[in-house]
């Protein structure tokens, strides 16, 4: 059965909904509504016409699409208006700006306002000087309109800015710079009218506004993850190189070279075509740079460039079917492809306008029912309908293989060539960055038919086995013949199960042979009933039958019988030596591994697109990922990915598959020792912090893995496992820069040890903990662990407690005695650990806590003794009992241990202490905690022991008295307890470490000072560091103190934070919580804030984005209050806090803006001036109104705090932004710049003058006037009115 011409449509013929083009010829050709023969289409001109009529209208782009011709018609298709005066024009423009700046106006009003701008332009608005001033003010309105959700508003906005560019040319430079990034965001839009409007507007701007600053804006999008955006970018670069003069390009020649270089290596075939066209445009302007670029390319890319030059010159250098589409909503109703073949490339007998359909895959991201319907409609296609005969299996693509050898491919005498890349597999339609092309990208109609699973996306082990055993792959051109009546399926595969093409039917040439081999399928053809696509979630079992490379069929199908191929050819040595597995055991191993892994979800990412699964989990032994895992090499596409921002974007993606690939890219960068900048580090730490919060347990309560969730829980665990691997590399490379993040890292890893994780994942968490322990300073880790132990916001479960204790215990083995510091936080932590020795629910916790106490005692005996002396009697009794029991149990004391108190004991035996941080449920049985120490009392008689005990008892009593004071101060003499003599005698006794093990029993009978610290309740659930520290500092004024108030305050703060985390919910409750928090700031002791400050700051900054303006204003006032009372805490958060405070000035509510101004003013007086200036200067130069205004005002306050010498050094950073602001269209910004310059002059005097050389004479005169007024004592209000009067 042959398909009729009218039915033969490709799923990819039409443009994707993200705005991608149907072929590389889009910018140059107008496709008529009636399909024409391919020969008629290839003779068109390569370049667009001067009017920009690159037709991409409805006939080509689909319903709703617009092009430049439509724009040109719409420019003047507007109501007629008349301009009577300058005032009349200003009134009209002000009304227009008011309507466009408020998206609450009805959408048709906004569309009419945009049309009215064009009406005014037609009426001659450009002849009025005031128009250009108002045009600057309209920038924000244009941006807002281009972002509108209504397509009609977006279309009118694009037409209007295009018309402005056409009329004003380079005078539209400022507007073009602002609007182009917004227009780029329209390109991947699923609404064609939006996507094509943005594209047409950018084209017109490029043609008429030749501003060099546009080049970086375009080039920055060349690394977009959207394939549609990248294609357009290279097309725009080509247009720009064609239209602009060389002098306009010179400044950014390096950017152009680098962008084109990336494009030539792009993963998308069509993007590569556009980049190659741009290369020849670059060569016309900069032959030297182009030559250098050419020489830096690999030979395969050089050949491709040359072959494109030698070709017909037509843009149709690629068949339309050889392209990718990133759309997840693409329509199945496609028009006929115009570029099915280029004339002269394919023998006439093999030409057919229906060929693309025979080479397309089904799409799993579209409606499966529609795909199944399309399959049914095309099921009777005959053998002669396409360029390639029966040998081409479903899923074949226009450019199926890439050959890396230097052999010239013969396309004149053969229908297609079978090319094998370095993987020893055929190449799918979408080329990854690791698959370098030769000339098939550039050769229309050079379809290849590969014998082994032609066109499938990954070479499974089975394919390699088949190719090796049967020797059916060849390095040269292979002919594929077919009898007219040969048995074959339709080449329109259906979406089945978890992949776009079911494995059993890939090799559909011999169904009878397949059916009895592949046991997992229900026959070679499979069911026509559509199954849920992977985007709806698929289980591992489902993927067995339908994933793209889990079928054993490919390795055993008798290819020769169905394909009529020559089996005498051999794999080239270069291919087989690199990638082909030659041993059967390797193949079996890899096949088993591949069968265990589920299919990869389809999506589009940088360098690895939907049809390239070189890195999918289901990839086979010959894929990049599995190959690199055996050989330790890094995948090629990862080696080429140097765009860290792109990698970080993927790591931060909500899509778990993208996140996985982002982590892989990050791993590759880290293994190449690519260091990250401070900003990149900060962002990556934030991303990792969020990843820790994601669910990864074996039994997650949120129901992941359902159809609704779209991804199985196994995927979460795989990504988390990869995250842990990346984390280890990240710590190893950047450990010197991560000390500020260590608290989050360490605490989150310890929490994960208490989660219900798989054994393999838990082992990776353990490895990360081991690396962390070895990478950071011991004293810093110890301080963090102490803080974490007493953190009131944490409620660790039993496993987490064991993990914390084991980590502390292991850490003490590598700590030096001086690393143990006796602080209030440490005393609290030790108290809590003592309570854990009586944990009723877990013997593991009890044993681990006992081991930690003994380890700490062993680490620094004098300090630990002092610490115990500061604790309440109940805690001393518990520690005494533990240590005494330990001594009795061991019965041994090493004589060598008697000596200096700073001498470390012999490390614990490896047999019992080798891995204290293994699984929390198993370690305690393997760790005989107290008995592991080797103490020896045989050489000491009882009199020595008891005399030592008496001395230590007195010393501890003395330390108990001193515990009310700061332990860092020298000991004070106290009447009645022996003064310094007692201390000395105690220290002498401390020299004998063994004696301390028997010291504690005497404490119960010895008298204690009246000011002993005796908390009422020191239970596990109520530790309060604030009252404890207060008692240490204020003991001389208070006779007794309980820690109830401290516990209450800390608990109150924790409850408030919990309430504040309900973003955009429970408004009244959160208002009350913020008010209470402000009260606590004024009353609470600082030690409570030691625990909670970071959490409070994070929540406050997040609350600034709340939906309620009252909440936003309150959050700013709380922030201001903290800044007022505890400014030193913001040292490490200055940049983030300043940015958030400045952004709050954009708030539409005046109450929030006032609060933001107060917070910014407090920041200017609280944060270090140097820090402020480093943050503010870039903002002043780059931010828009009103953020730049707020930054300038803040800078003015900061300048008042700077000394003359420091300010003079910083002038090169400060003054350029102020001079730029002096020209701002907003009068308030100009005023603020003048006041700031006056403030600078007040500090440094005439030293400012040399930096003002760029100012015009009138502006200098005006500045001098206000400097004189300031010197004469004019008030700020007078200055404000005067400056306004002078027309600043």
Swiss-Prot record:
The keyword Cytoplasm applies. This is CLIP-associating protein 2. GO terms for cellular component: basal cortex; cell leading edge; centrosome; cytoplasmic microtubule; Golgi apparatus; kinetochore; microtubule; microtubule organizing center. A motif (SXIP motif 1) lies at residues 490-493. SUPFAM superfamilies: ARM repeat (SSF48371). The two SXIP sequence motifs are important for targeting to the growing microtubule plus ends. The gene is clasp2. Residues 19-32, 40-62, 317-337, 347-358, 616-630, 912-931, 1019-1030 have a biased composition (Low complexity). Residues 963-977 have a biased composition (Basic and acidic residues).
């Amino acid at each position: 059965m042959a398909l009729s011409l009218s039915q033969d449509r490709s799923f990819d013929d039409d443009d994707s909904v993200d705005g991608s083009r149907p072929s590389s010829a889009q910018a140059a050709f107008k496709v008529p509504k009636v399909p024409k023969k391919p020969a008629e289409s290839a003779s068109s001109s390569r370049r667009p016409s001067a009017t920009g009529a690159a037709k991409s209208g409805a006939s080509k782009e689909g319903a709703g699409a617009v092009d430049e011709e439509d724009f040109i018609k719409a420019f003047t298709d507007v109501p007629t208006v008349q301009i009577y005066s300058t005032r009349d024009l200003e009134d009209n423009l002000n009304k227009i700006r008011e309507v466009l700046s408020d998206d609450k106006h009805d959408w048709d009003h906004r569309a009419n306002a945009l049309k009215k701008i064009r009406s005014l332009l037609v009426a001659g608005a450009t002849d009025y000087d005031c128009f250009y001033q108002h045009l600057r003010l309209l920038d924000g309105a244009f941006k807002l309109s281009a972002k509108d959700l209504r397509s009609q508003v977006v279309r009118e906005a694009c037409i209007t800015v295009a018309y402005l560019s056409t009329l004003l040319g380079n005078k539209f430079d400022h507007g073009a710079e602002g609007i182009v990034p917004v227009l780029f965001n329209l390109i991947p839009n699923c609404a064609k009218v939006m996507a094509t409007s943005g594209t047409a507007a950018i084209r017109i701007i490029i043609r008429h506004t030749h501003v060099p600053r546009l080049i970086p804006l375009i080039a920055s999008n060349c690394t977009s993850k959207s394939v549609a955006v990248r294609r357009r970018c290279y097309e725009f670069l080509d247009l720009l190189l064609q239209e602009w003069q060389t002098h306009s390009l010179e400044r950014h020649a390096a950017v152009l070279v680098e962008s084109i270089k990336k494009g030539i290596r792009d993963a998308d075939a069509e993007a590569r075509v556009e980049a190659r066209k741009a290369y020849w445009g670059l060569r016309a302007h900069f032959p030297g740079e182009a030559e250098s670029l050419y020489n830096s390319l690999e030979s395969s890319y050089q050949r491709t460039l040359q072959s494109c030059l030698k070709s017909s010159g037509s843009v149709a250098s690629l068949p339309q079917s050889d392209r990718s589409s990133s759309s997840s909503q693409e329509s199945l109703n496609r028009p006929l492809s115009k570029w099915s073949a280029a004339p002269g490339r394919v023998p006439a007998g093999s030409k057919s306008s229906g060929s693309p359909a025979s080479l397309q895959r089904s799409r799993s991201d579209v409606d499966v029912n529609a795909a199944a319907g399309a399959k049914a409609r095309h099921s009777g296609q005959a053998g002669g309908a396409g360029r390639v005969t029966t040998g081409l299996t479903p899923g074949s693509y226009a450019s199926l293989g890439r050959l890396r050898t230097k052999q010239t491919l013969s396309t004149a005498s053969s229908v297609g060539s079978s090319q094998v890349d370095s993987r020893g597999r055929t190449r799918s339609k979408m080329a990854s960055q690791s698959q370098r092309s030769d000339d098939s990208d550039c050769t229309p109609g050079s379809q290849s038919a590969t014998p082994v699973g032609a066109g499938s996306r990954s070479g499974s082990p089975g394919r390699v086995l088949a190719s090796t055993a049967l020797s059916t792959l060849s390095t040269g051109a292979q002919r594929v013949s077919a009898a007219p009546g040969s048995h074959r399926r339709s080449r329109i595969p259906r979406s089945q199960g978890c992949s776009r093409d079911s494995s059993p039917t890939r090799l559909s040439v011999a169904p009878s042979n397949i059916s009895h081999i592949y046991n997992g399928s229900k026959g070679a053809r499979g069911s026509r009933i559509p199954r849920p696509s992977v985007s709806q979630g698929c289980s591992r079992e489902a993927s067995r039958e339908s994933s793209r490379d889990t079928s054993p069929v490919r390795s055993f199908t008798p290819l020769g019988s169905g394909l009529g191929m020559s089996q005498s050819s051999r794999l080239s040595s270069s291919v087989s030596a690199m990638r082909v597995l030659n041993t059967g055991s390797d193949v079996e191993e890899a096949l088993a591994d591949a069968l265990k892994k589920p299919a990869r979800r389809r999506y589009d990412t940088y360098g690895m697109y939907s049809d390239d699964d070189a890195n999918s989990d289901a990839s086979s032994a010959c894929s990049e990922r599995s190959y690199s895992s055996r050989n330790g090499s890094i995948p090629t596409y990862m080696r080429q990915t140097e765009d860290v921002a792109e990698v970080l974007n993927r790591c931060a993606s909500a899509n778990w598959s993208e996140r996985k690939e982002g982590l892989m890219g990050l791993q590759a960068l880290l293994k190449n020792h690519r260091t990250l900048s401070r900003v990149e580090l900060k962002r990556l730490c934030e991303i990792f912090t969020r990843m820790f919060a994601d669910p990864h347990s074996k039994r997650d309560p949120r129901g992941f893995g359902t159809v609704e969730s779209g991804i199985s829980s196994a995927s979460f665990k795989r990504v988390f496992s990869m995250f842990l691997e990346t984390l280890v590399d990240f710590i190893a490379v950047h450990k010197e820069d991560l000390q500020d993040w260590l608290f989050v890292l360490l605490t989150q890893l310890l929490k994960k040890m208490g989660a219900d994780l798989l054994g393999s994942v838990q082992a990776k968490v353990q490895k990360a903990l081991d690396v962390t322990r070895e990478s950071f300073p011991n004293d810093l880790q110890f301080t963090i662990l102490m803080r974490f132990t007493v953190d009131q916001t944490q409620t660790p479960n039993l496993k987490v407690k064991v993990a914390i204790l084991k980590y502390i215990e292991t850490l003490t083995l590598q700590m030096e005695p001086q690393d143990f510091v006796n602080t209030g936080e440490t005393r609290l932590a030790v108290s809590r650990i003592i309570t854990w020795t009586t944990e009723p629910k877990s013997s593991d916790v009890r044993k681990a806590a006992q081991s930690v106490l003994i380890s700490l005692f062993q680490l620094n005996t004098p300090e630990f003794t002092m610490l115990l002396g500061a604790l309440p009697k109940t805690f001393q009794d518990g520690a005494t009992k533990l240590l005494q029991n330990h001594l009795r149990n061991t019965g041994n004391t090493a004589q060598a241990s008697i000596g200096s108190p700073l001498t470390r004991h012999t490390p614990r035996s490896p047999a019992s202490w080798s891995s204290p941080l293994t699984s929390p449920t198993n370690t305690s049985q393997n760790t005989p905690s107290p008995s592991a120490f080797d103490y020896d009392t045989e050489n000491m008689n009882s009199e020595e022991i008891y005399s030592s005990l008496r001395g230590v008892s007195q010393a501890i009593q003395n330390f108990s008295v001193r515990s009310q004071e700061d332990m860092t101060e020298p000991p004070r003499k106290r009447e009645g307890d022996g003064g310094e003599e007692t201390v000395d005698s105690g220290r002498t006794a401390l020299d004998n470490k063994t004696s301390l093990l028997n010291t504690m029993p005497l404490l119960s009978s010895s008298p204690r000072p009246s000011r002993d610290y005796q908390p009422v309740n020191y239970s596990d659930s109520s530790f309060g560091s604030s009252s404890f520290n207060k008692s240490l500092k204020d003991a001389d004024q208070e006779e007794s103190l309980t820690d109830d108030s401290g516990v209450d305050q800390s608990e109150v703060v924790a409850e408030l934070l919990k309430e504040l985390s309900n973003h955009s919910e429970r408004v009244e409750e959160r208002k009350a919580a913020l008010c209470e928090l402000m009260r606590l700031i004024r009353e609470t002791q600082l030690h409570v804030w030691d625990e909670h400050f970071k959490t409070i700051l994070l929540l406050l900054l997040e609350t600034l984005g709340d939906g309620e303006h009252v909440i936003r204003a309150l959050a700013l006032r709380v922030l201001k209050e903290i800044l007022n009372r505890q400014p030193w805490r913001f040292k490490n958060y200055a940049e983030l806090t300043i940015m958030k405070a400045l952004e709050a000035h954009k708030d539409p509510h005046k109450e929030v803006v006032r609060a933001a101004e107060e917070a910014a003013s407090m920041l200017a007086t609280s944060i270090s001036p140097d820090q402020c200036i480093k943050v503010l200067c870039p903002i002043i130069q780059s931010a828009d109104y009103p953020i730049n205004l707020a930054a300038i005002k803040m800078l003015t306050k900061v300048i008042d705090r700077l000394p003359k010498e420091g300010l003079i050094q910083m002038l090169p950073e400060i003054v350029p932004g102020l001079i730029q602001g002096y020209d701002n269209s907003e009068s308030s910004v100009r005023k603020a710049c003048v006041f700031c310059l006056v403030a600078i002059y007040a500090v440094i005097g005439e030293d400012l003058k040399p930096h003002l050389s760029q100012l015009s004479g009138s502006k200098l005169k005006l500045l001098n006037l206000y400097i004189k007024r300031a010197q004469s004592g004019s008030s700020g209000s007078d200055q404000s009115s005067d400056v306004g009067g002078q027309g600043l």
